[in-house]
């Protein structure tokens, strides 16, 4: 590119395909070389130009829509570490967007070496297209999930609608904002959190569970394609009473300067879904580019204590025991339910809820009549 658990350095923004944001991370050493006079640069390059060219690598990581701040910190750290240990030049391009959309772009030819997604099904789509290995989940610890979060609620100052639990989200006086589950992993977890609540409230009454979901979805005021759009709709445009998103995202919003004067508040329901953030190597791409070693090291880096601590600072729940113990007071107590334990696992969830003509489509269609 020229512009380039619990229960059961420079950043250059570039236009990406289909509106996806792409960021480029370049090392300080590379900037230093670029600043050399042409003659000096030529003399320095002459003895080993072929070797230097062979060592230069570019990695493209495709990730979820609200991952900008996190990966803008992770990527320069990894670039510095890799170049110190291996030499040569490494550049990381970063693509952001709803992960379902990202997966489709990879299927259509986007050359992502790695994916750091926020839901398993979008990696499984790549497995079915033989872009990712079938055993991807066993290639890294914790089912290839370096960190996780949960779905929580962001409400307006003083919590005027007294939102406490999933039941409150189905009340007729409450309006919701969260992304479209067809395009966003974030939104699928929000939907599944509501579905889990309905199943626990009405364990033997499918009709009552569906009725609850109908009321819940009927309260959605805005269905953006990704998490960032949902945040803008709620926080900047004033839409809705409740924003459903990752706990980590809400905490980042509350700690940031952009919306601090609005006094938003975090509500963590007593029960919610565990939102794993799975990672994988896109085998077909790394084999073609010769980047498997650096791609694997990049994902392994996210399990290092340094990055586990960084993840916790970004309000993400992690697996490293020492970091977990040190940050225990940072996170609300919540019973987390893993969607993988739902009937049929993620494959069953996809077929039942999110496939064309599935329960989500049925409920949305019913709400329009």
PLM regions with names:
Residues 30-34:
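N-terminal export leaders
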Residues 158-164, 183, 196-204, 285-293:
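Short helix-loop capping/hinge motifs at secondary-structure junctions, enriched
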Residues 201-269:
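Ligand-binding pocket segment of bilobal, Venus flytrap-like solute-binding proteins
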